[in-house]
């Protein structure tokens, strides 16, 4: 009997450790806000139903940064579906069209790039000049905002071009969205009739091929899980990611995480987003 009591006591002693080692998603977000001395906005949404599963500051505005490039390429694909654009169309540009961080487009000054290649560069490598060239095809920031209104997003707005849109001034609504609005818009682009099935597959594939998101949720993704994502980084501690996740290599949920107004380093911001992602995944697996 004494042996059984000792076993029970030993088992109970381990329970608090397990809880503290694996915080619930909202607990992790609150911890991240404290450690970052900034603000975190997050939503976890079921892809099929659109039901919100977890949310924190989901209706507060955060800078989009480069996460807008997914919506931009969605607008480009909508034009392709309407017969107003072709992914194979070649766009030529000049040295003066290039802005900071253009790792792909800077190599093609002589031969130009197709619309499809520009979208791939904008999403997979976050190429800023590629994004600006694509923005010009949809009517600039105002044209992209108009597209958002057409598909029912009355919150998200783009007001400037790369790279000025990453300024992330406190209280500035320019170039912002909310986690809830971004998740709903991404869901519309990937599941509704806003885009053809072919264009939906293409947009998703570009996100699957993202090559600059390694330190974030991808760093904590279990084996066999699906991820398609796009990150963003800005001034004044702004950082963000929009992603689709799921076990068994299937996209089942949309996760949007934004940070702002933190003095933390890029490495610290990446670590906090990864920690939130890990908490979401672990809670999902229970």
Swiss-Prot record:
GO biological process: beta-lactam antibiotic catabolic process; response to antibiotic
Pfam families reported for this sequence: Beta-lactamase2
Note: The class A beta-lactamase family has a specific amino-acid numbering system, sometimes called Ambler or ABL numbering and often misspelt as Amber. A multiple sequence alignment was used to derive a consensus sequence and then the consensus was numbered taking into account insertions and deletions. This allows use of identical numbers, e.g. for active site residues, despite differences in protein length. UniProt always uses natural numbering of residues, hence there appear to be differences in numbering between this entry and some papers.
Residues at which substrate binds: 230-232
Disulfide-bond pairs as recorded: 73-119
Transmembrane segments: none
GO MF assignments: beta-lactamase activity
EC number: 3.5.2.6
Protein name: Beta-lactamase SHV-24
Top class in the EC scheme: hydrolase
């Amino acid at each position: 009997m004494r042996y059984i009591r000792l076993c029970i006591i030993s088992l109970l002693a381990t329970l608090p450790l397990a809880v503290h080692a694996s915080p619930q998603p909202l607990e992790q977000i609150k911890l991240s806000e404290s450690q970052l001395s900034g603000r975190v906005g997050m939503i976890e949404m079921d892809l099929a139903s659109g039901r919100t599963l977890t949310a924190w500051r989901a209706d507060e505005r955060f800078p989009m940064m480069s996460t807008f490039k997914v919506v931009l390429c969605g607008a480009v694909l909508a034009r392709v579906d309407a017969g107003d654009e072709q992914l194979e169309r070649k766009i030529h540009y000049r040295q003066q069209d290039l802005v900071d961080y253009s790792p792909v487009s800077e190599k093609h000054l002589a031969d130009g790039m197709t619309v499809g290649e520009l979208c791939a560069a904008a999403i997979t490598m976050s190429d800023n000049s590629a994004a600006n060239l694509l923005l010009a095809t949809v009517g600039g920031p105002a044209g992209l905002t108009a597209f958002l209104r057409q598909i029912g997003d009355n919150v998200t707005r783009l007001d400037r071009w790369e790279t000025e849109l990453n300024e992330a001034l406190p209280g500035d609504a320019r170039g912002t969205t909310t986690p809830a609005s971004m998740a709903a818009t991404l869901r519309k682009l990937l599941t509704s009739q806003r885009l053809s099935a072919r264009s939906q597959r293409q947009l998703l594939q570009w996100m699957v091929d993202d090559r600059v998101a390694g330190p974030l949720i991808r760093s904590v993704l279990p084996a066999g899980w699906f991820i398609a994502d796009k990150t963003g980084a800005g001034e004044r501690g702004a950082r963000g990611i929009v992603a689709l996740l799921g076990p068994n290599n299937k996209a089942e949920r949309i996760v949007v995480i934004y940070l702002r107004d933190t003095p933390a380093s890029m490495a610290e911001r990446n670590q906090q987003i990864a920690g939130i992602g890990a908490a979401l995944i672990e809670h999902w697996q229970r």
